[in-house]
UniProtKB/Swiss-Prot annotation:
Residues where Ca(2+) 3 binds: D152, D166, F167, A170, D172
Subcellular localization: Secreted, Extracellular space, Apoplast
Organism classification: Eukaryota, Viridiplantae, Streptophyta, Embryophyta, Tracheophyta
Chain positions recorded as substrate binding sites: 76-77, 201-206, 230, 292, 311, 393, 398-400, 420
Gene this protein is translated from: AMY1
Protein's name in the database: Alpha-amylase 1
Record SUPFAM superfamilies: (Trans)glycosidases, Glycosyl hydrolase domain
Length: 423
């Protein structure tokens, strides 16, 4: 009887701390940038200071950097996957402490899963560095050249042909190898059960077939998962982004469908690319030929994760810095699952503005599959109604005429933006 009472209490406590989230209420937060490993006192320890603010903003899932030993300090050249004590972000104990603190605030942690490639400990004359160690006392993840794709141009192993794109910084792992599938799945499940992660951010999913992502999702049952499928967009001869990016967003949709859908989402790079061009006086871009949002959120919003910048794009494909808040006005009032970037929320002083927008989103029940009616998409004005509950506009044009009905009241406004709620 005591055991039963304990079980019932534990179950009740779980649902109090972790209410049942659907994609409609999910809100992501990327907790790091490319320089976070340099944090004095350790990144994991430093993040404790921001947990209350992150929780108060309504964040449900927090994306953490790759946790394993890595040749590169940022974590994206992992080697001994079970070794979490050699990470530049902090120790295994510090990571577990951070995740526990997040859990106590009802926030679930996502691990950055880098499995397309892996760095090795020893080399031979043919394959180069192709002898791997897993970071345990046994032979888990201790691999040799037979676990490396045989058509890797820089590290020619003896495994199966690569099922995706090449990455020349480290050997491409053969994900068709049954032992690779088994041991990586076991490692990911260990990250869940022993470390406390609830889900995954899959790095560089272009590096292996979509069926491989599907397999790891099925084998690990994450609460939430998102893949990084970053393809080039189309540009015209003048160097400007083409208006029609349907092929680009269709590629994201196809990847989701082939990888199984469900809890799996994809970063909406289409929306990011279009939005950062649109805010430069080309807001007409934000309406496709069918009158819908032009990104992935226009065709598969329930599996789209919208964002303004991340640790990579912030260095190489950055959103116009003076228009970042306009970007958040857009993604936090539109369908899809928004992801807030550490730099903008913590370092740029946008905490209050972003929190206000999140509050409006949550108050009105705007979610990943909310409806959008675009009422204006001109060079200097974009105005849309979401779920017949919220109207938003971005752009310098002030006169919106009769586009905002009298039964809507201004909820929040600033330079070149406004948000109204239904009375």
């Amino acid at each position: 009887m005591t055991s039963l009472h304990t079980l019932l209490f534990s179950s009740l406590l779980f649902f109090i701390v972790f209410p049942t989230f659907t994609f409609s209420s999910t809100l992501l937060f990327q907790s790091f940038n490319w320089e976070s490993w340099k944090k004095e006192g350790g990144f994991y320890n430093s993040l404790h200071n921001s947990i209350d603010d992150i929780a108060n903003a309504g964040i449900t899932h927090l994306w953490l950097p790759p946790p394993s030993q890595s040749v590169a300090p940022e974590g994206y050249l992992p080697g001994k996957l079970y070794d979490l004590n050699s990470s530049k972000y902090g120790s295994e104990a510090e990571l577990k402490s951070l995740i526990k603190a997040l859990n106590q605030k009802g926030i679930k942690a996502l691990a950055d899963i880098v499995i397309n490639h892996r760095t090795a400990e020893r080399k031979d004359d043919k394959c180069g560095y192709c002898y791997f160690e897993g970071g345990t006392s046994d032979d888990r993840l201790d691999w040799d050249p037979s676990f490396v794709c045989r058509n890797d141009p820089k590290f020619p192993g003896t495994g199966n042909l690569d099922t995706g794109g090449d990455f020349d910084g480290a050997p491409d792992i053969d994900h068709l190898n049954p032992r690779v599938q088994k041991e990586l799945s076991e490692w990911m499940n260990w990250l869940k059960t022993e470390i406390g992660f609830h889900g995954w951010r899959f790095d560089y999913v272009r590096g292996y077939a979509s069926s491989i992502t599907k397999l790891y999702v099925q084998n690990t049952s994450p609460d939430f998962a998102v893949g990084e499928k970053w393809d080039d967009m189309k540009y015209g001869g003048d160097g400007k982004l083409d208006y029609d990016q349907n092929e680009h967003r269709s590629g994201l949709k196809q990847w989701i469908e082939e990888a199984g859908g469900g809890v799996l989402t994809a970063f909406d790079f289409t929306t990011k690319g279009i939005l950062q061009s649109a805010v430069k006086g080309e807001l007409w871009r934000l309406k496709d030929s069918q009158g819908k949002p032009p990104g992935m959120i226009g065709i598969m919003p329930g599996n789209a994760v919208t964002f303004i910048d991340n640790h990579d794009t912030f260095r190489t494909w950055v959103f116009p810095s003076d228009k970042v808040l306009l970007g958040y006005v857009y993604i936090l009032t539109h369908p899809g699952t928004p992801c807030i970037f550490y730099n903008h929320y913590i370092e740029w002083g946008l905490k209050e503005s972003i929190s206000k927008l999140v509050a409006i989103r949550n108050k009105n029940g705007i979610g990943s599959t909310s409806s959008v009616t675009i009422k204006a998409a001109e060079a200097d004005l974009y105005l849309a109604m979401i779920d017949d509950k919220v109207i938003m506009k971005i752009g310098p044009k002030q006169d919106v005429g009769t586009l905002v009905p009298s039964n809507f009241a201004l909820a929040y406004s600033g330079l070149d933006f406004a948000v109204w709620e239904k009375k």
